[in-house]
Regions:
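The feature marks non-catalytic terminal segments
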Residues: 28-133
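Surface-exposed cleft-lining segments at the edges of enzyme active sites
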Residues: 5-11, 61
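Structural motif
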Residues: 1-2
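Charged helix-capping and loop-helix junction motifs
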Residues: 16-23
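Active-site environment of divalent metal-dependent phosphoester hydrolases
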Residues: 10-13, 42
Length: 133
């Protein structure tokens, strides 16, 4: 079994606690994968800071291609946060546009989701902005 947790890019306390619990599981040998908290991970600097936050291993990125149906489901799921979306997406492009833009950037022109595996005993190569390869 694999455990999925937020990378805690947006510094929300609940995400930070989930990240800490996931790291503890990884230290016990449980495979752990972290997802990028959208929309906070859209900021390359915030993402690099989250990845630089101490962890007992290295980060290995992997991209998962998204079909148009999966991208649409992601937008629908984000739209369910009715109390948060008016605050989060009040400036700039709307939520749908930001989701698509981010997915295309992550997938280098094709919609994708980026996940981060925590690999105990490995060091993370130097990360750089803005692409966060």
């Amino acid at each position: 079994a694999r455990f999925y947790a937020p990378l805690a890019v947006g510094n929300h306390v609940d995400h930070q606690l989930a990240r800490a619990a996931a790291i503890a599981l990884a230290e016990e040998g449980v495979p752990v994968t972290f997802y990028e908290d959208f929309p906070y991970a859209a900021s390359a600097d915030a993402l690099v800071r989250a990845l630089a936050n101490p962890a007992p291993g290295g980060w290995r990125a992997r991209r998962i291609a998204l079909t148009s149906e999966e991208l649409e489901r992601k937008k629908q799921a984000i739209a369910c946060y009715v109390s948060q979306n008016p605050v989060i997406f009040r400036h700039g492009p709307g939520m749908d546009e930001q989701v698509v833009e981010y997915a295309l950037r992550v997938g280098e022109g094709r919609p994708a989701e980026r996940l981060w595996d925590l690999v105990i005993g490995e060091a993370t190569p130097a990360l750089r902005s803005p692409s966060v390869s």
